[in-house]
Amino acid sequence: MSREALQETLSAVMDNEADELELRRVLAACGEDAELRSTWSRYQLARSVMHREPTLPKLDIAAAVSAALADEAAPPKAEKGPWRMVGRLAVAASVTLAVLAGVRLYNQNDALPQMAQQGTTPQIALPQVKGPAVLAGYSEEQGAPQVITNSSSSDTRWHEQRLPIYLRQHVQQSAVSGTESALPYARAASLENR
């Protein structure tokens, strides 16, 4: 962009008639060109006088900060010796050891009451039944079911008589209801072959 075009765009920016693209161009050019910055400063002073605004003394803060940064010495670089890496490794190992010891101590404190309770409970010896496996069979016959078990108590027979009826009713009702659940897909093992 030519010098005259930049000054015209700068004048349009000062009159608040420039669009965003022109404003960006002027700001980018002012960042690189000190003469354009001084022109902008003069235009700003002329605008303030024409609008009868109070004028402040010229303060170029950006130039003062740039000069101060240029005069400042660069900070010294940290030495990268082998001891620095060993120190970091030692700190990491110490933190890891402290965490592991804390976890172990915490778990031991929780385990002590449980171990004390386990030591005071009496051990119950269960009788072991030795014999062949018992197979139970169910049939649809109206006659009495054949019981293969060794028990002859009548209080367990009602389970053997009613269980097939309950299973059959369950399968029929779950198929009728048509609900979307896992239970309709469960099959009774004794009714599957019928």
From Swiss-Prot:
Entry keywords, A to Z: Alginate biosynthesis, Cell membrane, Membrane, Transmembrane, Transmembrane helix
A molecular function (GO) term: sigma factor antagonist activity
Record-linked Gene3D superfamilies: Anti sigma-E protein RseA, N-terminal domain (1.10.10.880)
Gene Ontology CC annotations of this record: plasma membrane
GO terms classed as biological process: alginic acid biosynthetic process; regulation of polysaccharide biosynthetic process
InterPro entries: Anti-sigma-E_RseA-like (IPR052383), Anti-sigma_E_RseA_C (IPR005573), Anti-sigma_E_RseA_N (IPR005572), Anti-sigma_E_RseA_N_sf (IPR036147)
Principal place of residence: membrane
Compartment annotation: Cell membrane
Transmembrane annotation, as ranges: 89-105
Keyword Membrane: yes
Keyword field contains Transmembrane: yes
Entry membrane topology: Single-pass membrane protein
Highest taxon, organism lineage: Bacteria
Function noted in UniProt: Negative regulator of the sigma factor AlgU. Plays a role in the differentiation of P.aeruginosa into the alginate-producing form. Inactivation of mucA causes a switch from the non-mucoid to mucoid state resulting in constitutive expression of alginate biosynthetic genes.
Entry's family note: Belongs to the RseA family.
Protein name from the UniProt record: Sigma factor AlgU negative regulatory protein
